[in-house]
């Protein structure tokens, strides 16, 4: 049962950003690069109008409204990515065994984690750069999902199972997501 006559969500296009929409594929080009994403859902229309991206659906149900707002958030994140970019900061924590973290190609290699002989590896997604500076790992890129997934891959690579995590707190932990500090 429709809730309203229509749902209309708008996203402002800032100066220096170009948005093109062809067959449900939204392309955003800005000073830091270009992103492309397919946003498709039955009955939901996406178009540009007066310097704005408009997401529109007639006679929406609850799910249609949720989809329209999700598309709005995706487009806003794409615009923010090509203008400012996204940065995640991770902290390397160890007590007894000094671990070394380095970038090799499209992987982050963690050596001597809890004294292990075999290095642990975390995948770096395309379009993401990882820098290791002492005990800090910085993950940067224009695609929010790729940057977040790369940071999560690094954090998951040092996950400890079957040991008491209150005692063995070694690992690499996300301390700042997209400029916002994490509360523990």
Swiss-Prot record:
Part of the 50S ribosomal subunit. Keywords: Ribonucleoprotein, Ribosomal protein, RNA-binding, rRNA-binding. The keyword tRNA-binding does not apply. GO terms for biological process: cytoplasmic translation. The keyword RNA-binding applies. GO terms for cellular component: cytosolic large ribosomal subunit. The gene is rpl6. NCBIfam families: PRK05518.1, uL6_arch. Belongs to the universal ribosomal protein uL6 family. PROSITE patterns: RIBOSOMAL_L6_2 (PS00700). This is Large ribosomal subunit protein uL6. One of its GO terms (molecular function) is rRNA binding. Pfam families: Ribosomal_L6. HAMAP family: Ribosomal_uL6_A. This protein binds to the 23S rRNA, and is important in its secondary structure. It is located near the subunit interface in the base of the L7/L12 stalk, and near the tRNA binding site of the peptidyltransferase center.
